[in-house]
Amino acid sequence: MSWQAYVDDRLMCDIDGHHLTAAAILGHDGSVWAHSSTFPKFKPEEITAIMKDFDEPGSLAPTGLHLGGTKYMVIQGEGGAVIRGKKGSGGVTVKKTGQALVFGIYEEPLTPGQCNMIVERLGDYLIDQGL
């Protein structure tokens, strides 16, 4: 399965008639492996800050998680494994695997729990595959 197929079929999948607003799979270095057409253009320093938070959980809390110029308030995640952010009626989930970062961005009516499930399920699968 290609990386783009993972984004199209596993991340942008239909859930009760709704789907993520945007999704992507990036390398730890910020290289884009695959993304939805709606995924925001991000700055390299935004990915660097996200990677730092995985190494030093809580480092994003004071400044927020920035992605494509949008600021998300960091909410409880799983230190070193998952970062979650909230902005208004939407948010973002980032799951770190051995080699990749899996991103999901959502807006209502999708719920934070649905976004977490989609992103973390693919992330766990990639970890099981050694990726």
UniProtKB/Swiss-Prot annotation:
A Pfam family hit: Profilin
UniProt xrefs under PROSITE patterns: PROFILIN (PS00414)
Major localization class: cytoplasm
Species of provenance: Malus domestica (Apple)
Subcellular location: Cytoplasm, Cytoskeleton
Keywords linked to the UniProt accession: Actin-binding, Allergen, Cytoplasm, Cytoskeleton
InterPro entries: PFN (IPR048278), PFN_euk (IPR005455), PFN_sf (IPR036140), Profilin_CS (IPR027310)
UniProt KW Disulfide bond keyword: no
Cross-referenced CDD domains: PROF (cd00148)
Family: Belongs to the profilin family.
Domain of life assignment: Eukaryota
Highest classification ranks of the organism: Eukaryota, Viridiplantae, Streptophyta, Embryophyta, Tracheophyta
GO molecular function: actin monomer binding
Gene Ontology annotations for the cellular component aspect, listed alphabetically: cell cortex; cytoskeleton
Job description of the protein: Binds to actin and affects the structure of the cytoskeleton. At high concentrations, profilin prevents the polymerization of actin, whereas it enhances it at low concentrations. By binding to PIP2, it inhibits the formation of IP3 and DG.
Name of the protein described by the UniProt record: Profilin-1
Subunit annotation: Occurs in many kinds of cells as a complex with monomeric actin in a 1:1 ratio.
Keyword Phosphoprotein applies: no
